[in-house]
Amino acid sequence: MALALITGSSGHVGSNLIRELTKQNYNVRCIDFDGDHRAYEGFDVEIIKGDITNKSSLDPIFKNVDVVFHTAALINLDRRYRDQIRSVNVDGTRNVCEASLSAGVKKLIHFSSVDAFYRFPIEEPLLEDRKLIDDPNAVPYDLSKADGQKIVMEFCEKGLDASIIHPTSI
């Protein structure tokens, strides 16, 4: 049975992934950052205390993992939290990519955001070839998701097999 690792497993997307992956008979390992275990109640999952911003803690967590669902993110639109947002969404994503590549993970599914793209022209469909935000004065969350996505794409060039998903606000 395949082993799936979920970052951000106590969040909205992560907790729904737990439900779906267990239905599909995956073994599920969850990185628990905040100690809120409500998302795991009633599910046979492995819970490991961890923090994606702490690179040295990730190697044992990624051991024997087949697929990583990287949903962890700090969602905040307040510019005062720019450094914390970048720490999680950019540096944390780099750490997840490095740990995935080092551990020989078969697939990384990165949850970016539609907010990683420039919104204009608004009348045109937003397709994945639209330019990523690169304005340092942009909303910190938006810029962090664009920069995190660029990191994932850089790791793909190094051999990481990854897919990027762009959910809307959830």
Task: Locate predicted features.
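Conserved glycine-rich Rossmann-like NAD(P)H-binding loop of the short-chain dehydrogenase/reductase
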Residues: Y26-G35
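Conserved Rossmann-fold NAD(P)-dependent oxidoreductase catalytic core, especially the SDR/UDP-sugar
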Residues: N95-Y141, S163
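N-terminal Rossmann NAD(P)H-binding glycine-rich loop of SDR-like oxidoreductase domains
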Residues: A2-Q24
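NAD(P)H-binding glycine-rich loop region in Rossmannoid oxidoreductase-like domains
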Residues: V45-D91, A99
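Active-site beta-alpha turn of Rossmann-fold NAD(P)-dependent dehydrogenases/reductases
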Residues: A72, I109-S112, T168
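Conserved cofactor-binding/catalytic machinery of classical short-chain dehydrogenase/reductase
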Residues: N54, D91-N95, K107, D147-G148
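Residues forming the Rossmann-fold NAD(P)(H) cofactor-binding site
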Residues: G14-N16, V90, A146
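Active-site Tyr-X1-5-Lys
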Residues: P136-H166
